[in-house]
């Protein structure tokens, strides 16, 4: 099987439960993901070696995001711990004729403030297909 590297932003998704609107919700469901992270998880589920490269804050929320990847056997050894916050997006799931709504809060997230110096690209791509 292939060794595939993906790089992008992992985000914290806060979703309203039970198709509630934002204004109706008293709580949110939590999930971690993002386009490239989701690809890494899918590849791992198909038996490939996948490694996700990103930056997360060096705090408990950052570690929760990393743990969410690890539980699907996605490699996390090249995730930088830097910056101050994880990007967040809020999801109001649509219902019947009402469309879903998404609100992004990702300004100044860890990956957006990371620099090339935060990553060892030679090590990251070693053995990648």
Question: What would you call each of these model-derived segments?
Answer:
Residues 88-92:
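Short beta-strand scaffold segments in enzyme catalytic cores
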């Amino acid at each position: 099987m292939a060794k595939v590297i993906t790089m992008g932003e992992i985000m914290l998704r806060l979703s309203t439960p039970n198709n509630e609107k934002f204004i109706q919700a008293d709580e949110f469901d939590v999930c971690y993901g993002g386009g490239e992270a989701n690809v890494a998880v899918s590849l791992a589920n198909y038996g490939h070696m996948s490694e996700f490269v990103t930056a997360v804050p060096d705090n408990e929320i950052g570690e929760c995001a990393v743990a969410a990847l690890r539980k699907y056997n996605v490699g996390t050894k090249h995730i930088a711990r830097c910056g101050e916050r994880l990007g967040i997006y809020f999801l109001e799931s649509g219902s019947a004729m009402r469309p879903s709504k998404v609100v992004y809060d990702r300004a100044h997230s860890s990956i957006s403030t990371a620099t090339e110096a935060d990553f060892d690209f030679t090590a990251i791509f070693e053995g990648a297909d």
